[in-house]
C-alpha cells in the first residue's frame, strides 16, 4: 500500500491507498516519492520542462464576435482566441460573451510577470486592428495562470523521460496519466481516450 501524508489545515493526516494515479508534473512526483530515487532520476526530472499559459478572459456584451469556436493567431501576444458562447451559452454570465486569449510563456518570464492590465493593453490593440472587438465594449477582464500547462519537448526529452519511467515502473500500481502527469502533448479528446483506456486496463486486471 501507499502511505499518503497530507495536511488538512494545521492537522497532518496519514492515509493509505492501494493505487496511485498521478496527474501532477513528473518533476514534482519524483521529489515526493519514497524511497528516494537515484540522482540520475532527479537530474532527468530537472531536465523536463513545461510551458506555462496565461488565459486572459475579456467579457463583452452578448454578441457573436467570430463565426467559429476558436481561432489560432500568429504575430500576436496570444496564440489562440476562444469564443466562449460558441461552446455553450451558459459558460458566460447572462447577457455577456467572453473572449479567452491564450498566452503561452515560461514560468516567471517577462510575460508571466505582466499584470492583467499590461496583458490587456498589449492585446486590445490587435483585437481592435483585427476588427474582433473594440475597447469601449469591454466590461471587465481577468486572468487565470497555469504554471505547468504543456510539456515542452526539448532535445533529449525522450532520454530523460525514459530514465524516469524506467525507475517509476518498478513501483506497482503507480500510474502516470494526462498531459502533465505523463508528459504527453495531447488534446482534450486524447486525454479522455487515454483515461478510458486506463480504466479498461484496470477492469481487465480485476483491480477495480
List the model feature ranges, each with a label.
Residues 1-117, 122-131, 144, 162-170:
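Mid-domain catalytic core of redox enzymes
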Residues 120-208:
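C-terminal catalytic lobe of FAD-dependent flavoproteins
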Amino acid at each position: 500500500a501507499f502511505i499518503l501524508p497530507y495536511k488538512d489545515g494545521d492537522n497532518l493526516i496519514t492515509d493509505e491507498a492501494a493505487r496511485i494515479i498521478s496527474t501532477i508534473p513528473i518533476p514534482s512526483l519524483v521529489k515526493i516519492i519514497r524511497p528516494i530515487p537515484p540522482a540520475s532520476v532527479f537530474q532527468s526530472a530537472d531536465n523536463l520542462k513545461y510551458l506555462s499559459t496565461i488565459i486572459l478572459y475579456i467579457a463583452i456584451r452578448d454578441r457573436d464576435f467570430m463565426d467559429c469556436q476558436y481561432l489560432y493567431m500568429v504575430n500576436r501576444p496570444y496564440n489562440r482566441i476562444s469564443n466562449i458562447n460558441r461552446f455553450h451559452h451558459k459558460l458566460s454570465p447572462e447577457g455577456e460573451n467572453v473572449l479567452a486569449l491564450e498566452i503561452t510563456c515560461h514560468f516567471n518570464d517577462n510575460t508571466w510577470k505582466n499584470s492583467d492590465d499590461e496583458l490587456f493593453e498589449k492585446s486590445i490593440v490587435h483585437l481592435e486592428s483585427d476588427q474582433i472587438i473594440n475597447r469601449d465594449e469591454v466590461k471587465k477582464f481577468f486572468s487565470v495562470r497555469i504554471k505547468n500547462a504543456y510539456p515542452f519537448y526539448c532535445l533529449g526529452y525522450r532520454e530523460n523521460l525514459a530514465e524516469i519511467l524506467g525507475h517509476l515502473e518498478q513501483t506497482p500500481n503507480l500510474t502516470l496519466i494526462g498531459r502533465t502527469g505523463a508528459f504527453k502533448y495531447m488534446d482534450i479528446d486524447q486525454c479522455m481516450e487515454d483515461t478510458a483506456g486506463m480504466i479498461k486496463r484496470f477492469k481487465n486486471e480485476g483491480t477495480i
